[in-house]
C-alpha cells in the first residue's frame, strides 16, 4: 500500500480519533506551559528545590499524556483493530486540525508517539505517521489582542548616546516585572553598558540599530536569563544577561555573555533544560538559531525542555544523513564497555549504546537498574558535565551498512534486543549520545600543555558533579570524554549515585602487621561505602598526571571534602555552578553581592582550565 492515497474522507471515526489525539496534545502542552510559566514565581521566591522538582516532573509529563491518549483511543475506538485506510484518514483530518495551531510540529510528534504505541512497525511510514513534517512552522503568530509577541524590539532613543542605551537596558529589565528587588539595578546596568562598549567598541550605528529580546525569561536552577541580540547594519550579535539572587536575597545581573561561543555554553547539551513560557516554540527556536547558527534545531528544542520534539527532529536528521552517506556502522574505537555495547557511524558525530544481556561478575547490575541511571541523568541537573542521551525503541537499520564484526558482537552480547528482518536489523532499545574523545585516549595523544589542562578539567568536572549531588561511581579516565571544543564530560552512568546516598570513609589504620601487609581488603565495606584515598592508585599512575592532579585537585582524595559537600547538600543547600567562566562575572565592591560565593566559584573553576584547553564551549 506504500504510496497509495485516500481520496475520500468517509470514515467519521477518523475525525473523532484525530480530535481525541489533538485534545491529548493540547492537555499536555497546557500543563507543560503552566509549569514553565510558574518558574518565574519560584525564582522570585528563591524556591530552588521547587524549581529542581518542576524540572524533573515536567520531563515525565509527556509520556503520561501519551499513555492517556493511547488508552483513550483503544477504549473508545478499538484503535489497534482499525484498517489502514482509516488510519490514513486520521492523519489527514489531523493535518486539517493543525492549520491554525500554534504548536503544530509538537502536535505532529505527539501524534507519532501515540500511534506508534498502537500500530505495528510496518505502519511507521509517511502514509500513516509524520515521518516528515506536514504543517509549516514559518511565521506563526498569535493574533489574540492580549498575546505577548515572541520578542520585543527596542530602539535606543538617542543612537550613539550612552544615556539612551542605558535607559533602554533599564526598560528591558523592567519589562520582565520581576517581583523581587535588585540590590542596585543602576549599578548593574552600568556594568552591562561597559560590557557592551567592550564588545562592540567604537562602531558607527546604522539606521536599523536595535536590540531584540525574547519576551520570556529563561529559567534554570538558580538563574533567570534575558536572551536577545543586538542588530547593527548587517551584523547580529546574540547576548544573554544572567539574573541571580545574591547573599542578601536581592537580585543582581551577574555578567553579560556575547556571541555564539558563549551562548553555546549556556545552551549546552550537557546542561539541564530551561523552563520558558512559550506560546509559539518554533518562533523561539528560529530566534535562537539566529544567535547560534551552528546549533541544530533538535538541540534547541531539547534545551527548551521539548526533548521529544528534539528526539523526533534528530531522527529525521539521522535518516537524511544515512540516505546521503555510504560508510558502515562499526564497533566504536576505545576500551569496550562491560555493560554497554557501543557502535558508531564514522561520518556521523554520535555513538549508539545498547545494554548487554549479561555482565561480568564485578558488575552487580540489571538492565532495569541501568535504564534507571540514564533516567536519573535525564531528569537531573547535568551542570555541563553529563552528556544528554536520546532513548529510542524499535529502530530499524539497513543490514548492508553494518560491518560483519558488529553484527556478530550484537548477536553475542545483545540477542534479546536484536530482530533480524530481511534487509533490516531492528534494535528494540538503544541510547544515542554525542561522540567524544575518551579522556584516556586524549591523554595518551596530548601535548604536555593539553595534558595539564585536561587533568584540571577532569577535576573540575568531578567537582561540578559533586555540587549537583552526583557521585560518578567509576571515575576512571575512560568514562569521561573530551568534546570537540575541549570540555571534559562524564558519560558512563551505570554506577552513578546521589552523593547523599554514599558513605565516604577514611581507610582504617591496620591493627596488625598481617593486615598492613595484606594485598586484600581486610576491613568491612558496605554497599554504598566510598574510600576516596583509594582513588589514587587507579587514576594517578602517570607521574606527570599525578603532579598536576595533586596541585589542583588533591582534596578529591580526602574523605572530608566529599563528606563536607554531602552534609551541605543534605542540609538543603543548592550549590551554584555557572554556565560560564567565573572570571567573566561582574566584580562588585568588597562586602556587596555574593560574598564568599565568589571565592568558592573561582576555586572550583580555575579560569585557565577552560580557556587554555579550548576557548569554545560545548
From Swiss-Prot:
Annotated positions binding ATP: 332-338, 353
Active site: 388
Matching InterPro entries: AceK_kinase, AceK_regulatory, Isocitrate_DH_AceK
EC number, UniProt record: 2.7.11.5, 3.1.3.-
CC annotations in GO: cytoplasm
GO molecular function: [isocitrate dehydrogenase (NADP+)] kinase activity; AMP binding; ATP binding; phosphoprotein phosphatase activity; protein serine/threonine kinase activity
Swiss-Prot/TrEMBL catalytic activity: L-seryl-[isocitrate dehydrogenase] + ATP = O-phospho-L-seryl-[isocitrate dehydrogenase] + ADP + H(+)
A GO biological-process term: glyoxylate cycle
Tree of life domain: Bacteria
Keywords, sorted A to Z: ATP-binding, Cytoplasm, Glyoxylate bypass, Hydrolase, Kinase, Nucleotide-binding, Protein phosphatase, Serine/threonine-protein kinase, Transferase, Tricarboxylic acid cycle
Pfam families xref list: AceK_kinase (PF06315), AceK_regulatory (PF20423)
Compartmental location: Cytoplasm
Role: Bifunctional enzyme which can phosphorylate or dephosphorylate isocitrate dehydrogenase (IDH) on a specific serine residue. This is a regulatory mechanism which enables bacteria to bypass the Krebs cycle via the glyoxylate shunt in response to the source of carbon. When bacteria are grown on glucose, IDH is fully active and unphosphorylated, but when grown on acetate or ethanol, the activity of IDH declines drastically concomitant with its phosphorylation.
Sequence similarity: Belongs to the AceK family.
The protein's name: Isocitrate dehydrogenase kinase/phosphatase
Amino acid at each position: 500500500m506504500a504510496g497509495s492515497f485516500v481520496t475520500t474522507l468517509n470514515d467519521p471515526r477518523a475525525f473523532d480519533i484525530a480530535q481525541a489525539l489533538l485534545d491529548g496534545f493540547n492537555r499536555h502542552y497546557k500543563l507543560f506551559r503552566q509549569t514553565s510559566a510558574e518558574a518565574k514565581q519560584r525564582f522570585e521566591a528563591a524556591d530552588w528545590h521547587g524549581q529542581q522538582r518542576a524540572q524533573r516532573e515536567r520531563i515525565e509529563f509527556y509520556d503520561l499524556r501519551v499513555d492517556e491518549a493511547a488508552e483513550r483511543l483503544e477504549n473508545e475506538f478499538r484503535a489497534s483493530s482499525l484498517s489502514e485506510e482509516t488510519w490514513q484518514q486520521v492523519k489527514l483530518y489531523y493535518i486539517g486540525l493543525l492549520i491554525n495551531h500554534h504548536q503544530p510540529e509538537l502536535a505532529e510528534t505527539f501524534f507519532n508517539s501515540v500511534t506508534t504505541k498502537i500500530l505495528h512497525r510496518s505502519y511507521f511510514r509517511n502514509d500513516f505517521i509524520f515521518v516528515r513534517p506536514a504543517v509549516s512552522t514559518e511565521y506563526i503568530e498569535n493574533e489574540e489582542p492580549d498575546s505577548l509577541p515572541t520578542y520585543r524590539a527596542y530602539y535606543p532613543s538617542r543612537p550613539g548616546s550612552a544615556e539612551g542605551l542605558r535607559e533602554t537596558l533599564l526598560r528591558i529589565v523592567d519589562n520582565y516585572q520581576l517581583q523581587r528587588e535588585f540590590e542596585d539595578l543602576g549599578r548593574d546596568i552600568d556594568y552591562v553598558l561597559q560590557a557592551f562598549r567592550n564588545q562592540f567598541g567604537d562602531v558607527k550605528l546604522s539606521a536599523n540599530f536595535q536590540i531584540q529580546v525574547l519576551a520570556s525569561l529563561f529559567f534554570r536552577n538558580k538563574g533567570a536569563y534575558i536572551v536577545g541580540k543586538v542588530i547593527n547594519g548587517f551584523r547580529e550579535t546574540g547576548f544573554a544577561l544572567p539574573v541571580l539572587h545574591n547573599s542578601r536575597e536581592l537580585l543582581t545581573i551577574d555578567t553579560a555573555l556575547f556571541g555564539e561561543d558563549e551562548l553555546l555554553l549556556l545552551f549546552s547539551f550537557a546542561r539541564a533544560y530551561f523552563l520558558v513560557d512559550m506560546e509559539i516554540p518554533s518562533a523561539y527556536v528560529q530566534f535562537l538559531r539566529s544567535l547560534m547558527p551552528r546549533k541544530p534545531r533538535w538541540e534547541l528544542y531539547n534545551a527548551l525542555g521539548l526533548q521529544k520534539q528534539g528526539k523526533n527532529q534528530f531522527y529525521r536528521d539521522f535518516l537524511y544523513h544515512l540516505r546521503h552517506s555510504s560508510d558502515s556502522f562499526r564497533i566504536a574505537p576505545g576500551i569496550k564497555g562491560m555493560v554497554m555495547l557501543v557502535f558508531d557511524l564514522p561520518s556521523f558525530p554520535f555513538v549508539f549504546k545498547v545494554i548487554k544481556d549479561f555482565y561480568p561478575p564485578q558488575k552487580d547490575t540489571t538492565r532495569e537498574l541501568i535504564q534507571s541511571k540514564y533516567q536519573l541523568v535525564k531528569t537531573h541537573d547535568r551542570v555541563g558535565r553529563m552528556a544528554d542521551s536520546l532513548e529510542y525503541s524499535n529502530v530499524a537499520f539497513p543490514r548492508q551498512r553494518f560491518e560483519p564484526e558488529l553484527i556478530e558482537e550484537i548477536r553475542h552480547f545483545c540477542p534479546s534486543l536484536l530482530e533480524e528482518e530481511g534487509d533490516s536489523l531492528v534494535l528494540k532499545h538503544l541510547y544515542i549520545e554525542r561522540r567524544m574523545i575518551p579522556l584516556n585516549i586524549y591523554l595518551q595523544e596530548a601535548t604536555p600543555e593539553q595534558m595539564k589542562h585536561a587533568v584540571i578539567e577532569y577535576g573540575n568536572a568531578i567537582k561540578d558533579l559533586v555540587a549537583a549531588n552526583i557521585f560518578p561511581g567509576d571515575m576512571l579516565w575512560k568514562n569521561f570524554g573530551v568534546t570537540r571544543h575541549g570540555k571534559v564530560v562524564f558519560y558512563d552512568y551505570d554506577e552513578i549515585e546521589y552523593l547523599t546516598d554514599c558513605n565516604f570513609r577514611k581507610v582504617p589504620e591496620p591493627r596488625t602487621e598481617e593486615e598492613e601487609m595484606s594485598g586484600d581488603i581486610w576491613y568491612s565495606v558496605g554497599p554504598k561505602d566510598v574510600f576516596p584515598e583509594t582513588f589514587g592508585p587507579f587514576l594517578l599512575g602517570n607521574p606527570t598526571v599525578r603532579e598536576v592532579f595533586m596541585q589542583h585537585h588533591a582534596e578529591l582524595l580526602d574523605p572530608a571534602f566529599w563528606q563536607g559537600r554531602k552534609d551541605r547538600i543534605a542540609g538543603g543547600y543548592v550549590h551554584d555552578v555557572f554556565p560560564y567562566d567565573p572570571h567573566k562575572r561582574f566584580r562588585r565592591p568588597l562586602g556587596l553581592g555574593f560574598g564568599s560565593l565568589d571565592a568558592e566559584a573561582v576555586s572550583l573553576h580555575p579560569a585557565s582550565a577552560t580557556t587554555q584547553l579550548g576557548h569554545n564551549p560545548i
